[in-house]
C-alpha cells in the first residue's frame, strides 16, 4: 500500500498564502488549510451555524508528499523559504512544523473532508470541484480544486474581495486581478458580468493553478492568465483592479493602479491586517484615489477606492 507523508505547519494568518505556496513549490500534492476565522457566522450544509470556536491568529496548513520524497530535504527547503519570508517582514508568528506518514486511503479522503460548498455572498457560492451541487435560482457557482493550494476561497480576505466585486461590478467592465492565486477573484469577476479579465501572478505555480481552476468553470473564456510582477509594465487600462495580497506589497501597487484605472474606476485592496490598515490607506490616497468603502471581518480589512474628481459619495467627501 502506497503511503503519503503529511507535513503540518502552523503560522500566523497573514502568511497563509505565502506559506501554502512554499509547500506546493516543495512538491506537495495538495494543501489543506484550517482557519478558525472561516467558521465565524458560516452555516453548515444543513443551514445551522457552526458552534462557537476559540479564535486564534494562527492557521494550520497541512501538505501531502509522496512516500518517495525526502522529507528532511523538504523540511530544509521550507525552512529556507520561511527565513526569506521573515527577511521580508512577513508575520509568521510562533512556528511549529511536524510530519507523519499517512496511508493512501487516508490521503484520498482526509484532505477532502476539510471542504464543503460555502455560500460566500448573496450571489456567489464556492463549490469543491468533486462535489455534485445544484445551484438555486440566481446563485452563481465558482468551482475550485482546493487540493491545488491557496485554500478554499473562504478566507476572510477572499470573502471581503468577493463582496467588494459584487458591489462595484455592473457588467461590461475590464478587470485586472493582481496576484490571482487560485483564480477565484477572476472567476467571480467573469460571473458577475465583467467583459474581460486579466489575471497576473509572479509565481508559476499560481499561474498554473489559476488556469486549472478557471477551466473547471463555465463561461470563463474571457479570462486571460499570465505571469506578471504586480502591475509593472502593463499598459492595459481597466475599470476595476482587485488585489488580495499582503499589505506590504499592496503599497507598491497603488501608483501603477492609478495609472491604469479609467476615470470613475475602482481599486479593491484586501489582505490588510488591521495594524497595517493606515499604511495601505495612505499609499492609495497619496496616489490620488478617494476612499469609498471600508469593510472589516475580524482583524482583516478590505478597501474600495475610486478614481474620481466627484467627491460626493466618498468617505470624507
UniProtKB/Swiss-Prot annotation:
Coiled coil: none annotated. It is an enzyme of class 2 (transferase). CDD domains: AdoMet_MTases (cd02440). InterPro entries: Ribosomal_L11_MeTrfase_PrmA (IPR050078), Ribosomal_PrmA_MeTrfase (IPR004498), SAM-dependent_MTases_sf (IPR029063). Signal peptide: none annotated. It catalyses: L-lysyl-[protein] + 3 S-adenosyl-L-methionine = N(6),N(6),N(6)-trimethyl-L-lysyl-[protein] + 3 S-adenosyl-L-homocysteine + 3 H(+). GO terms for cellular component: cytoplasm. Keywords: Cytoplasm, Methyltransferase, S-adenosyl-L-methionine, Transferase. GO terms for molecular function: protein-lysine N-methyltransferase activity. S-adenosyl-L-methionine binds at residues 158, 179, 201, 244. It is found in: Cytoplasm. One of its GO terms (biological process) is methylation. Pfam families: PrmA. Its EC number is 2.1.1.-. PANTHER family: ELECTRON TRANSFER FLAVOPROTEIN BETA SUBUNIT LYSINE METHYLTRANSFERASE. Methylates ribosomal protein L11. Belongs to the methyltransferase superfamily. PrmA family. This is Ribosomal protein L11 methyltransferase. The gene is prmA.
